[in-house]
From Swiss-Prot:
It catalyses: (S)-2,3,4,5-tetrahydrodipicolinate + NAD(+) + H2O = (2S,4S)-4-hydroxy-2,3,4,5-tetrahydrodipicolinate + NADH + H(+); (S)-2,3,4,5-tetrahydrodipicolinate + NADP(+) + H2O = (2S,4S)-4-hydroxy-2,3,4,5-tetrahydrodipicolinate + NADPH + H(+). It comes from Pseudomonas syringae pv. syringae (strain B728a). This is 4-hydroxy-tetrahydrodipicolinate reductase. It is an enzyme of class 1 (oxidoreductase). It is found in: Cytoplasm. Keywords: Amino-acid biosynthesis, Cytoplasm, Diaminopimelate biosynthesis, Lysine biosynthesis, NAD, NADP, Oxidoreductase. One of its GO terms (biological process) is lysine biosynthetic process via diaminopimelate. The lineage of its organism: Bacteria, Pseudomonadati, Pseudomonadota, Gammaproteobacteria, Pseudomonadales. PROSITE patterns: DAPB. (S)-2,3,4,5-tetrahydrodipicolinate binds at H156, G165, T166. Catalyzes the conversion of 4-hydroxy-tetrahydrodipicolinate (HTPA) to tetrahydrodipicolinate. Pathway: Amino-acid biosynthesis; L-lysine biosynthesis via DAP pathway; (S)-tetrahydrodipicolinate from L-aspartate: step 4/4. Belongs to the DapB family. NAD(+) binds at G8, A9, A10, G11, R12, M13, D34, G98, T99, T100, A122, A123, N124, F125.
Length: 267
């Protein structure tokens, strides 16, 4: 059995991950971790996820359950994930990282850790989104410099980073296909007298409202026609199942920084 731990286990995504792990053949939740000051420490992780008792108590200390798992799934916050990364690197534990909002320097730390442990890091673990990334690469290469490119995304009111990691990853894929540097061509929102649009730019627009799980659209607009590639998620379980799939795939893999495209064989 693949022994899986979930950090941030008392949160919305954490509970969904617990359910996904318990549903996956050959996988089992053997550790669940949350903040040390959480009032839920000691509670049964299965009961927190409304699955019934599974005999795995919520821990407030990752080090105390280090012997209980093979791979850690982390969908938390960059500061938390980096601390967990340092621990897992030292302990020789594999990681699945779905946290977004990392700086360029922080991403470099993930790459460094990948020299010692196997890691799957992805902005989005949905199979559908990763298929879209493949399609975006093809679309950008075919349409080339003859279109204007805009990326729109919408998420729930609680999401703290913008644009989403998925939107940025989509922008990276498109920019790379066109030989552009996203940092130089990205335009984040527009207001006032912006002047005519520069076709070399890639625009981003963000919406935050209600309980939207995640909507992403990349628009390729030419004179006379438009192509849109859209993905809409209706449940966090989509991401959770992908993360568990990655955790199973990582079993026996050599140290390295992998992504969901590797897991799905899309590279």
């Amino acid at each position: 059995m693949r022994r899986i731990a979930v950090v941030g286990a008392a949160g919305r995504m954490g509970k969904t991950l617990i359910e996904a792990v318990q549903q996956a053949p050959g996988a089992g939740l053997t550790a669940a971790i949350d903040r040390p000051d959480s009032t839920l420490v000691g509670a049964d992780a299965g009961e927190l996820a409304a699955l019934g008792r599974i005999g795995v108590p919520l821990s407030g200390d990752l080090a105390k359950v280090a012997d209980e798992f093979d791979v850690l799934i982390d969908f938390t916050h960059p500061s938390v994930t980096l601390k967990n990364l340092a621990f897992c690197r030292k302990a020789g534990k594999a990681m699945i990282i779905g946290t977004t909002g990392f700086s360029a320097e922080e991403k470099q730390r993930l790459e460094e850790a990948g020299k010692d442990i196997p890691i799957v890091f992805a902005a989005n673990f949905s199979v559908g989104v990763n298929l879209c990334l493949k399609l975006l690469d093809t679309a950008a290469r075919v349409l080339g410099d003859e279109v204007d490119i805009e990326i729109t995304e919408a998420h729930h009111r609680h999401k703290v980073d913008a644009p989403s990691g998925t939107a940025l990853r989509m922008g990276e894929v498109v920019a790379n296909a066109l030989g552009r540097d996203l940092e130089k061509v990205a335009v984040y929102g527009r207001e006032g007298q912006t002047g005519a649009r520069d076709r070399q730019t890639i625009g981003f627009a963000t919406l935050r409202a209600g309980d939207i799980v995640g909507d992403h659209t990349v628009l390729f607009a030419a004179d006379g026609e438009r192509v849109e590639i859209t993905h809409k998620a209706s449940s966090r379980m989509t991401f959770a199942k992908g993360a568990v799939r990655a955790a199973m795939w990582l079993d026996g893999k050599a140290p390295g920084l992998y992504d969901m495209q590797d897991v799905l064989g899309l590279h």
